[in-house]
Amino acid sequence: MASPYPSSGSQFNAMVTDFRRLAAAVGRKGRGERVLQDLSNSLARAKSKLRSKAGQRVAIATPGGTSSAPAIRMFSQNSQTADVVRRLGLKDGWTGNARYGFATVGLEALSRVNGWLAFVYPPQFERQVSGITKTSAYKRLPVVKAKRVRTLGGTTWLFGGPRSTMLFADRLAASLSR
């Protein structure tokens, strides 16, 4: 049985291993390998697009909590998302590990973001995010003042397999290349 949150090692590598197992289990091993090659090619293209940003820090965030108690999930170093950031030649913009690959924090914690902040949120969180970004506390954040916040499309999924990983890498590269 696959473990979506391995206690050690890379969640990215675990995703690849699990994908290969699934492809073999359904008799589509060759197709699975082609998808993984597409993933490798996609990451290489995104890394090339980000060459001028190599070594810069990028923190990935998504909304958490509720509209009445907003919170932010920061993806930690042991997440698949942070692993992709590193594979693109960038550095983690959020430190620490968390059991499920992200830590839920309040707005004030964003003051620790040094570098870029990529905010990923689906349309149903628009109101919550709007409420956060309109506050004076948000507007005073160093990363906001430096105009280093980017949003990725609402259909970007951060917990999936190869195809969603490709979409995340492509959108991150496009947003940071603007």
Residue spans of the language-model regions?
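Residue-level "edge-of-site" marker
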Residues: P4, A98, P123
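Extracytoplasmic substrate-binding proteins
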Residues: M1-S67, T155-R178
